[in-house]
Amino acid sequence: MVEALLSGIVLGSIPITLAGSFVTAYPQYRRGDQLDLR
């Protein structure tokens, strides 16, 4: 039962972490793209 709970927490936290990193990196990418600083 503990393994199922831990796997559920891990599988639930991975998309949240990816979405959070994407949301924080996307405005910086857009700013750099507008300034043409690739």
Curated annotation (Swiss-Prot):
Gene Ontology molecular function: electron transporter, transferring electrons within cytochrome b6/f complex of photosystem II activity
Q: Which Pfam families match?
A: PetG (PF02529)
Q: Say which domain of life the source belongs to.
A: Eukaryota
Q: Membrane-spanning regions, if any?
A: 5-25
Listed A to Z, the keywords are: Chloroplast, Electron transport, Membrane, Photosynthesis, Plastid, Thylakoid, Transmembrane, Transmembrane helix, Transport
Q: How does it assemble?
A: The 4 large subunits of the cytochrome b6-f complex are cytochrome b6, subunit IV (17 kDa polypeptide, PetD), cytochrome f and the Rieske protein, while the 4 small subunits are PetG, PetL, PetM and PetN. The complex functions as a dimer.
Gene Ontology annotations of biological process type: cytochrome complex assembly; photosynthesis
The similarity comment for this entry is:
Belongs to the PetG family.
Which chain positions lie within coiled-coil regions?
none
Q: Which organism is the protein's source?
A: Huperzia lucidula
* Any one GO CC term of the record: chloroplast thylakoid membrane
Q: Give the protein's biological function.
A: Component of the cytochrome b6-f complex, which mediates electron transfer between photosystem II (PSII) and photosystem I (PSI), cyclic electron flow around PSI, and state transitions. PetG is required for either the stability or assembly of the cytochrome b6-f complex.
Topology versus the membrane: Single-pass membrane protein
Q: Does the keyword Phosphoprotein apply?
A: no
UniProt-annotated location(s): Plastid, Chloroplast thylakoid membrane
Q: What name is this protein filed under? A: Cytochrome b6-f complex subunit 5
